[in-house]
Amino acid sequence: MISIEAYRESFEEEPGYLDFAAFGPLSPAVREEAHADLEALGTGRRSGIEHVEQHVNLARELVAELIGSTAEQVTLQPSTTQGIMQALFGVTGATMVSPNEVITLPLAAQRAADALHVLTPQWLETTDGMVTPEAVRDALTPDTTALAVSLVDYRTGYRTDLSALREVIGDRLLIVDAVQGFGIVEADYQAADVVAGNGYKWLRAGRGAGFAWFSERALERLTPVFSGVTGTDVMGLPTDFVPPVSRSAHAFTVARP
């Protein structure tokens, strides 16, 4: 672990920059690794290409460490939005979501409903726009199968209590857009079933560093819809046949990052 002094010195952006909730300027470590990878990929050597490809597993392990899970349950995604859509397009039944959430959540719910007709958006109306355990409890119905929520509200900074929401919704699916707080706030991610986020804000890792974690319950209940060549259990590139979809989190991926 680096010292607090070394960590402080890694912030090289202009003095006064405070907009990490929108974009975190890339850290020196990220820039150095990116440059090194570009040089390795520029040589054409197989060893350099394979070295860069191994970073996929490392990234999954690091995300898993922050969530408190295993890397096998973590998928890398192009963005938070794609991770959320992988989850919501796989839901069947009424999914509770506030129309006041960041547009990613209500948009994904509505698009999934329009395209597949198996998810029904259950719009959660609140007086202050905050998704509290009390508001969710009052709105729950026997038809509710999932709740989609932001970890941190992007307008107010309200922090959602995932543990309390889990107590309220029981064994229903809890799908969390964590991008606004991942890496900066403590949260009980194990209370959730899907956690989607990105490294371009508080982790200072740049865009394209998205991920989605799936619990065992999520893997049992979600239907992989947007599943590509990496969504199978076949090692390497399948040829001359179409393999079945994986039963692991890989099912919710399309291609290698």
Where are these regions (language model features)?
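Pyridoxal 5′-phosphate
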Residues: 1-257
